[in-house]
Swiss-Prot record:
Belongs to the NHP6 family. It comes from Aspergillus fumigatus (strain ATCC MYA-4609 / CBS 101355 / FGSC A1100 / Af293) (Neosartorya fumigata). Keywords: Chromosome, DNA damage, DNA repair, DNA-binding, Nucleus, Transcription, Transcription regulation. Weakly associates with the stable spt16-pob3 heterodimer to form the FACT complex. DNA-binding protein that induces severe bending of DNA. Required for DNA-binding by the FACT complex, a general chromatin factor that acts to reorganize nucleosomes. The FACT complex is involved in multiple processes that require DNA as a template such as mRNA elongation, DNA replication and DNA repair. Also augments the fidelity of transcription by RNA polymerase III independently of any role in the FACT complex. This is Non-histone chromosomal protein 6. One of its GO terms (biological process) is DNA repair.
Protein backbone atom coordinates (compact mmCIF):
# COMPACT_ATOMS: atom_id res chain seq x y z
CA UNK A 1 0.00 0.00 0.00
CA UNK A 2 1.55 3.36 -1.06
CA UNK A 3 2.20 5.99 1.52
CA UNK A 4 0.01 9.01 1.47
CA UNK A 5 1.77 12.21 0.69
CA UNK A 6 1.61 14.68 3.46
CA UNK A 7 2.47 18.21 2.65
CA UNK A 8 2.25 21.29 4.69
CA UNK A 9 1.53 24.57 3.13
CA UNK A 10 3.29 27.54 4.48
CA UNK A 11 1.59 30.84 4.36
CA UNK A 12 3.54 33.41 2.48
CA UNK A 13 3.20 37.02 3.31
CA UNK A 14 2.00 39.14 0.48
CA UNK A 15 3.76 42.39 0.01
CA UNK A 16 1.23 45.13 -0.21
CA UNK A 17 1.82 47.49 -3.07
CA UNK A 18 1.04 51.13 -2.81
CA UNK A 19 -2.14 52.00 -4.61
CA UNK A 20 -1.42 53.95 -7.77
CA UNK A 21 -2.63 57.50 -7.53
CA UNK A 22 -5.23 58.06 -10.27
CA UNK A 23 -4.13 61.70 -10.47
CA UNK A 24 -0.52 60.76 -11.22
CA UNK A 25 0.63 61.70 -14.75
CA UNK A 26 0.65 59.00 -17.41
CA UNK A 27 4.08 57.88 -18.60
CA UNK A 28 5.31 59.02 -21.98
CA UNK A 29 4.91 56.70 -24.95
CA UNK A 30 7.93 55.34 -26.80
CA UNK A 31 8.55 55.97 -30.49
CA UNK A 32 7.50 52.38 -31.20
CA UNK A 33 4.20 52.85 -29.36
CA UNK A 34 3.37 55.93 -31.46
CA UNK A 35 4.17 53.88 -34.57
CA UNK A 36 2.12 50.90 -33.38
CA UNK A 37 -0.92 53.01 -32.46
CA UNK A 38 -0.83 54.67 -35.87
CA UNK A 39 -0.38 51.45 -37.87
CA UNK A 40 -2.38 48.86 -35.89
CA UNK A 41 -5.62 49.46 -37.81
CA UNK A 42 -3.81 49.25 -41.18
CA UNK A 43 -2.37 45.86 -40.24
CA UNK A 44 -5.82 44.60 -39.18
CA UNK A 45 -7.41 45.83 -42.45
CA UNK A 46 -4.70 44.15 -44.53
CA UNK A 47 -4.99 40.90 -42.54
CA UNK A 48 -8.60 40.30 -41.43
CA UNK A 49 -9.00 37.59 -38.81
CA UNK A 50 -5.42 37.93 -37.58
CA UNK A 51 -4.81 37.21 -33.89
CA UNK A 52 -3.75 39.84 -31.39
CA UNK A 53 -0.29 38.31 -31.05
CA UNK A 54 0.22 38.21 -34.81
CA UNK A 55 -0.70 41.91 -35.08
CA UNK A 56 2.03 42.74 -32.58
CA UNK A 57 4.53 40.53 -34.38
CA UNK A 58 3.82 42.20 -37.73
CA UNK A 59 4.06 45.67 -36.20
CA UNK A 60 7.43 44.74 -34.69
CA UNK A 61 8.70 43.51 -38.06
CA UNK A 62 7.54 46.71 -39.77
CA UNK A 63 9.19 48.85 -37.07
CA UNK A 64 12.50 47.02 -37.49
CA UNK A 65 12.30 47.52 -41.26
CA UNK A 66 11.95 51.32 -40.96
CA UNK A 67 14.95 53.47 -41.81
CA UNK A 68 16.21 56.14 -39.42
CA UNK A 69 14.58 58.89 -41.48
CA UNK A 70 11.22 57.05 -41.36
CA UNK A 71 11.52 56.63 -37.59
CA UNK A 72 12.40 60.27 -36.95
CA UNK A 73 8.79 61.61 -36.73
CA UNK A 74 7.90 58.96 -34.16
CA UNK A 75 11.05 59.65 -32.16
CA UNK A 76 10.21 63.37 -32.15
CA UNK A 77 6.70 62.61 -30.87
CA UNK A 78 8.20 60.38 -28.18
CA UNK A 79 10.65 63.09 -27.11
CA UNK A 80 7.82 65.64 -26.88
CA UNK A 81 5.70 63.18 -24.88
CA UNK A 82 8.63 62.46 -22.55
CA UNK A 83 9.04 66.19 -21.92
CA UNK A 84 5.28 66.47 -21.25
CA UNK A 85 5.53 63.62 -18.73
CA UNK A 86 8.54 65.12 -16.96
CA UNK A 87 6.82 68.52 -16.71
CA UNK A 88 3.60 66.97 -15.38
CA UNK A 89 5.56 64.78 -12.98
CA UNK A 90 7.48 67.76 -11.62
CA UNK A 91 4.30 69.73 -10.97
CA UNK A 92 2.61 66.62 -9.53
CA UNK A 93 5.52 66.00 -7.14
CA UNK A 94 5.54 69.65 -6.11
CA UNK A 95 1.83 69.41 -5.30
CA UNK A 96 2.45 66.19 -3.34
CA UNK A 97 5.19 67.88 -1.30
CA UNK A 98 2.86 70.77 -0.48
CA UNK A 99 0.15 68.33 0.65
CA UNK A 100 2.61 66.50 2.92
CA UNK A 101 3.79 69.74 4.51
CA UNK A 102 0.21 70.82 5.20
CA UNK A 103 -0.71 67.49 6.79
CA UNK A 104 2.40 67.46 9.03
Amino acid sequence: MPKEKTSTRTKTKRVERKKKDPNAPKRGLSAYMFFANENRDKVREENPGISFGQVGKMLGERWKALSDSERRPYEEKAAADKKRYEDEKASYNAAQDEDEEESS
